[in-house]
Swiss-Prot record:
Family: Belongs to the GatB/GatE family. GatB subfamily.
EC number of the protein: 6.3.5.-
Protein species of origin: Micromonas commoda (strain RCC299 / NOUM17 / CCMP2709)
Summary of subunit composition and partner proteins: Subunit of the heterotrimeric GatCAB amidotransferase (AdT) complex, composed of A, B and C subunits.
Protein's name in the database: Glutamyl-tRNA(Gln) amidotransferase subunit B-2, chloroplastic/mitochondrial
InterPro entries the record matches: Asn/Gln-tRNA_amidoTrfase_suB/E, Asn/Gln-tRNA_Trfase_suB/E_cat, Asn/Gln_amidotransferase, Asn/Gln_tRNA_amidoTrase-B-like, GatB, GatB_Yqey_C_2, Gln_synth/guanido_kin_cat_dom
Gene Ontology molecular function, alphabetical: ATP binding; glutaminyl-tRNA synthase (glutamine-hydrolyzing) activity
Major location (coarse): mitochondrion
Highest taxon in the source lineage: Eukaryota
Transmembrane parts of this sequence: none
Presence of the UniProt keyword Ligase in the record: yes
Note: This protein may be expected to contain an N-terminal transit peptide but none has been predicted.
Length: 529
């Protein structure tokens, strides 16, 4: 079952500056806790679930008597426009090795420079999870060799991470929910991508150096369903905050699971195994389920579960050994000599914390408890900040209307059904994309008139006020293409990603009023002539 988090919550937070590095001897030793080993010294915490004891079973034990223990390590790409230590763009789907700065390729003489926006977004995620965001953090080198790691080391935050502690409320299904403790959040640079050819290994460094935030959880999860639900909840939070897109199919969110088993009475406990690089929620659930079957079978036969790193094959649903972890790898962690500590000023920390929106789980609980909404309806409304804000505005207007009319009381459940039903349906039919401020004033009268016809009328007014006529859009597109000869040459030379530059410039010149799909169609016609 999920355990109640008792992690401490802090208040200060962030914009960054870099100051003189600490002397090597002054950097504190790495913390001993992880998502799946050792005991926690944090006050109020329960002992770790994983044990180094390997005891053989002296009597047959049914599968139902075994408890699965799972911790997660999530690697999420931060949505900053450029990479963590270089100015190269972070763009999925670009031509191989098109977005590579000298530092990303480890060229001699190139030096890292910290991306302040990436640090700010990581701090935002830390505050949202209730973590203790550190005003001072530092980077380390983690040494290992792989074709897609040109430096021969990864820059990470082993000793002094950006945030410690925190928790996340996880809803699994009706009647099953709880709180998952977070151990730490740390910034690190991503690796490149390697692929096997017939007689060689091909390396694409576009991803190398992208900002990752690694989220390490406590081993509080108890099975495949909870592990998958927790990962999905993290994805929703990352997207909700605008920290990143967390698209698992694109590799911008990858999950490792640490799995071990013990008898429910604690008499028999096995070692943990780590299953790496799971890229879908279904794969997470299947990997944990397979490890349950495999590990329990070993323990019931009185055999050891060896501490291993394993891979998962989605075609077979089975895991396989990548490497044995009985002898721990020596990553030779050392302070990063080319980067001073990251210092987040108190005023900036406070500003970032103040800007963190109410999380979906918190909003759903509030709507259920104070507005009396059904849990499922509350979760639907709480899934987007704009929907929550609009429901709150509608509820406030409904209360004001009730006050003016004396005896009439508007049921908040009716307001919620109207927002999620009539309004959302009318928005989809009208083809209006709401981006925040546009449309707020024209729709202010909606709470007093729940009719679909009235909604359609007002949305049509919004669409008319925020869209461009076809002639003006065509003229703008032509002007943009004419003003960007280098991008035009690149596109005609096969660099199709230049299309994004044209569309972006159109949106900039029209202040967001253009339809980007229509703009792309017009531009394609122009550049293909």
């Amino acid at each position: 079952m999920l355990r109640r988090a008792l992690a401490s919550r802090s208040s200060e937070a962030a914009i960054i500056s870099t100051r003189v590095s600490l002397p090597r001897g002054s950097i504190p030793p790495p913390p001993t806790s992880s998502s799946s080993s050792s005991s926690s010294s944090r006050e109020g915490r329960r002992p770790r679930f994983f044990s180094t004891t390997t005891t053989s079973a002296e009597r047959p034990v049914d599968d139902d008597e075994w408890e699965t223990v799972v911790g997660l390590e999530l690697h999420v790409q931060i949505g900053a426009k450029t990479k963590l230590f270089s100015g190269a763009e972070r763009l999925y789907g670009a031509e191989a090795n098109a977005n590579v700065a000298p530092f990303d390729a480890a060229l001699p003489g190139s030096l890292p420079a910290v991306n302040a926006r990436a640090v700010e977004l990581a701090a935002r995620l830390g505050f949202a999870l209730g973590a203790d965001v550190q005003s001072r953090s530092s980077f380390d080198r983690k040494h290992y060799h792989y074709p897609d790691l040109p430096h021969g080391y990864q820059i990470t935050q082993q000793r002094s991470p950006i945030a410690l502690g925190g928790s996340l409320d996880v809803f699994v299904r009706d009647g099953v929910s709880g709180t998952l403790r977070v151990e730490r959040l740390q910034l690190e640079m991503d690796t490149g991508k390697s692929s096997k050819a017939k007689s060689s290994t091909l390396v694409d460094l576009n991803r190398a150096g992208s900002t990752l935030v690694e989220i390490v959880t406590a081993p509080d999860l108890r099975g495949a369903e909870e592990a998958s639900a927790a990962a999905e909840t993290f994805q929703k939070v990352v997207r909700f905050l605008g920290v990143g897109d967390a698209n698992m199919e694109e590799g911008s969110m990858r999950v490792d699971v640490n799995v071990s088993h013990r008898t429910r009475d604690g008499a028999v406990a096995g070692e943990r195994c780590e299953v790496k690089n799971l890229n879908s929620f279904r794969s997470i659930a299947r990997a944990v389920a397979h490890e349950r079957t495999r590990q329990i079978a070993l323990l019931k036969r009185g055999q050891r579960v060896r501490r291993q790193t394993r891979s998962f094959d989605p075609a077979t649903g089975a895991t396989a050994v990548l490497r044995d972890k009985e002898a721990l790898l020596d990553y030779r962690f050392a302070p990063e000599p080319d980067l001073p500590p990251v210092v987040i000023e108190p005023a900036a920390l406070r500003a970032i914390k103040a800007a963190v929106p109410e999380l979906p789980s918190t909003a759903a609980a509030r709507l259920t408890n104070t507005a009396g909404l059904a849990p499922k309806l509350a979760q639907t409304i709480a899934s987007k900040p704009s929907t929550v804000a609009y429901f709150d505005a509608c509820a406030e207007a409904a209360d004001a209307w009730s006050t003016r009319n004396g005896t009439v009381t508007v049921d908040k459940q009716d307001v919620a059904n109207w927002v999620t039903g009539v309004l959302v349906g009318a928005v989809k039919r009208a083809g209006v994309t709401h981006k925040g401020g546009a449309g707020g004033e024209p729709l202010r009268g909606l709470p007093e008139s729940a009719g679909a016809a009235r909604v359609g009328e007002l949305l049509a007014r919004v669409a008319a006020s925020t869209s461009m006529d076809s002639g003006a859009l065509e003229a703008t597109c032509a002007a943009v293409v004419a003003s960007m000869p280098e991008q035009l040459a690149a596109y005609r030379g096969g660099r199709t990603r230049a299309m994004g530059s044209f569309v972006g410039e159109v949106m900039k010149r029209t202040k967001g009023r253009a339809d980007p799909r229509r703009a792309a169609e017009i531009i394609k016609t122009l550049v293909d002539q």
